[in-house]
C-alpha cells in the first residue's frame, strides 16, 4: 500500500489538484491547515483581524478569557449602555463572522470537488488551527478528527486543531483543542480517544512533544499526551504538521514520526516566504513501513529529495537524493 501524506496546504488547492493528477497512491492524507484566510480578499481579512484583536484585548482586560470571542461580543452587545464604538465594532464583527463561516464552507466545497476527482483512492482530511470543524463542511466524510477509518486492515485515526489562538479565524467555528490536560487527570480528550481506538497510524496537526515541535526562538511546543501515547502503544506512524520549520523523519520507541513541512506557500516567523510543495510517499508491506520518500512538487514536476529506510539504523536510514533542495530546508 502506498500512502501520500501532505500537511499545511494553506489554501493551495491548485497545488493539491496537481499533486493528485501527477501521483498514484492508495491513500492520500491531507492534514491541516487546509485554509489560509476565511475570506476571498486580504483587505477583509485584515479588517476582521483588527476587530478580533480589539475584542481579544477587551476580553483580557475584562477577565473573560474563558469565553469564545464571538460569545463575548454577543454578550457585550446585549449589555445596557455600551459605547457607540463598541456597538459599531461589535455589530461589524458579528457580520464578518457570519460571512467567514459562509466563505469557509464554500472553500471546503471547492477542495472536496478536487478530492472527489481521485475516485480510486481513499482520501482523508484533518483540520488544523486555521480550519473550522470539518463535520460541518463538505469534507465531513473524509474527516479524521476524533474519527478512525480502515486502510486495508490498518486503523488510521486523527486529532486536529492546536493549542494556540489563531488570529483572523473565528473561534466559534474552530476545533476546540482538548489535548492539553494531564493524561492522569482522565480529561485529555485526545489521549482518551486514541486509548479507546488503538490506531495503527495517528494523524495529529500538533506534533508530539520533543519531535518536530521546535519553534524558532520559542522552543518546544508539542503535545506531551501524544508523545506519551505513542511511547507506550504500538503506533506504526505518527503523522504531524503545524511546525513548518521543524520537519523530518524520526523514530522513537519504534514509532515513525513524519512532518513534511508546509505544502502551501506561507510567510515565516522571520518575514520570509516558504514556498512549500513538500510531501512524503510511504510504502507499506502489511504492517511494516518498507520505504519513505521525501518529495517536493515544483509546478507540475515532482522531485525526490531524500529516501528513508526504517529497517536500517542511525544515519544509514537516510539517503539524500537532491542535496541542493535538502540543504535549502536546513
Predicted regions and their residues:
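Beta-strand-turn-beta hairpins that frame and shape the catalytic cleft
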Residues: 1-4, 148-158, 197-201, 251-257, ...
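Core catalytic region of metal-dependent phosphoesterases/phosphodiesterases
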Residues: 6, 13-151
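Divalent metal-coordination and catalytic microenvironments
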Residues: 8, 28, 33, 128, ...
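Active-site environment of divalent metal-dependent phosphoester hydrolases
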Residues: 10-15, 35-39, 126-136, 164-169, ...
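Active-site-proximal segments of metal-dependent phosphoesterases and phosphodiesterases across multiple
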Residues: 86-104, 108, 112, 198-234
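Conserved beta-sheet core of the metallophosphoesterase superfamily
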Residues: 122-125, 141, 215-285
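A short C-terminal boundary segment appended to hydrolase-like catalytic domains
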Residues: 215, 284-330
Amino acid at each position: 500500500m502506498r500512502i501520500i501524506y501532505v500537511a499545511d496546504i494553506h489554501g493551495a488547492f491548485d497545488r493539491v489538484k496537481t499533486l493528485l493528477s501527477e501521483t498514484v497512491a492508495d491513500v492520500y492524507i491531507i492534514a491541516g491547515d487546509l485554509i489560509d484566510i476565511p475570506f476571498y480578499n486580504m483587505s477583509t481579512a485584515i479588517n476582521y483581524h483588527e476587530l478580533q484583536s480589539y475584542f481579544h484585548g477587551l476580553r483580557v482586560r475584562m477577565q473573560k478569557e474563558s469565553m469564545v470571542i464571538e460569545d463575548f461580543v454577543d454578550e457585550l452587545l446585549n449589555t445596557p449602555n455600551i459605547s457607540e464604538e463598541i456597538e459599531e465594532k461589535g455589530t461589524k464583527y458579528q457580520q464578518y463572522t457570519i460571512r467567514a463561516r459562509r466563505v469557509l464552507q464554500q472553500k471546503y466545497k471547492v477542495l472536496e470537488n478536487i478530492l472527489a476527482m481521485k475516485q480510486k483512492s481513499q482520501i482523508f482530511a484533518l483540520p488544523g488551527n486555521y480550519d473550522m470543524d470539518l463535520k460541518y463542511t463538505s469534507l465531513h466524510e473524509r474527516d479524521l478528527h476524533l474519527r478512525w477509518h480502515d486502510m486495508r486492515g490498518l486503523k488510521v485515526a486523527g486529532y486536529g486543531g492546536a493549542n494556540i489562538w489563531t488570529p483572523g479565524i473565528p473561534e466559534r467555528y474552530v476545533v476546540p483543542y482538548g489535548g492539553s490536560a494531564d493524561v492522569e487527570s482522565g480529561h485529555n480528550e485526545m489521549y482518551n480517544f486514541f486509548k479507546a481506538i488503538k490506531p495503527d497510524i495517528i494523524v495529529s496537526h500538533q506534533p508530539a512533544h520533543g519531535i518536530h515541535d521546535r519553534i524558532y526562538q520559542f522552543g518546544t511546543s508539542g503535545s506531551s499526551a501524544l508523545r506519551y501515547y505513542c511511547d507506550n502503544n504500538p503506533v506504526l506512524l505518527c503523522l504531524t504538521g503545524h511546525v513548518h520549520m521543524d520537519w523530518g523523519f524520526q523514530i522513537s520507541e519504534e514509532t515513525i514520526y513524519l512532518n513534511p513541512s508546509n505544502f502551501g506557500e506561507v510567510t515565516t516567523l522571520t518575514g520570509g516566504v516558504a514556498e512549500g510543495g513538500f510531501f512524503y510517499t510511504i510504502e507499506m508491506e502489511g504492517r511494516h513501513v518498507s520505504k519513505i520518500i521525501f518529495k517536493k512538487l515544483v509546478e507540475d514536476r515532482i522531485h525526490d529529495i531524500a529516501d528513508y529506510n526504517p529497517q536500517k539504523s542511525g544515519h544509514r536510514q537516510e539517503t539524500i537524493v537532491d542535496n541542493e533542495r535538502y540543504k535549502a530546508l536546513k
